Amino acid sequence: MERSRLKTIIILILAMMNLALALSLGLRLYQGRAAETALLTELRERFTAEGCALPENIPTEAPPMVVTMERDSGREQAMAEAILGGGTEYIDQGGGISVYRNGSGQATFRAGGSFSVTLRLPDGEATPMEQAEQRSRAFARAAGFETPTLLSGSGSAAQRYGGYPVSGAGASFSLRGSTLTAEGSYLSSAYLTKTEGPAMSAATALTRFLDFRSQSGAVIAEVTEISLCYLPRSTASAPMVLSPAWRIATDSGNYLVSCADGSVSRG
């Protein structure tokens, strides 16, 4: 009997502790949202005073993790063969430069992630435009780009990682006669590690952006959209690092606010 009563008391104590914890978490969440609402209200007032409009919706999501990657030569070979065809010869030119070539053309990859391709399309049943479309899309799939569409002989494809666009990463394609060229930059790497990065909110990024606008004298009347993206950083001797950033679209172009150091740049 005493044991049963003691057990009941323990259960009640645990239930009360869980309830107290839930109330504490709920209070913190409420206080956090209230503080965020107050910050956004203050931010809108400041932008209005500076003569710059903000969109109705300002994101509240946290930036993604920082991603460190290492170069993947196997992926570069797959990209080269996707656009050049099989039978490629590999040449290590040193300095982080890799070349794949065959009788049709050449693909060059550099340690920083940039690439260039020149290809002479063969005569066949398909027209040069049809061949260019097919090879460009095969190259984009191998690189992890979005699907390109060639209009009037030219097109482009962007790249995403983890659902976020990667600033500066993508490809442009051009067809002149029977010669197809491609150039751009991509994530020439395989996943290595993920780490927590600076948790910069959209509101903080907008504050940094407004300071930049005031100091630089840039003529910007409206912010049209705010979204997260990745900024790639790499050298010939160090792994590629993807750092989160806020992309701020305005009526005079796009700007990037780095979550790592708060710096603002054109994007």
Predicted regions and their residues:
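Preferential activation on post-signal-peptide N-terminal prodomains/segments
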Residues: 1-147
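Generic marker of "main functional regions" within proteins
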Residues: 33, 39, 50, 57, ...
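Exposed beta-strand-loop-beta-strand "reactive/processing" segments of non-cytosolic proteins
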Residues: 74-112, 116-121, 144-178, 227-259
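N-terminal trafficking/processing presequences and adjacent post-cleavage segments
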Residues: 103-126, 180-205
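Acidic, serine/threonine- and glycine-rich low-complexity intrinsically disordered segments
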Residues: 127-187, 193-196, 200, 219-224
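Extracytoplasmic/luminal low-complexity segments enriched in Pro/Gly and acidic/polar residues
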Residues: 179, 187-267
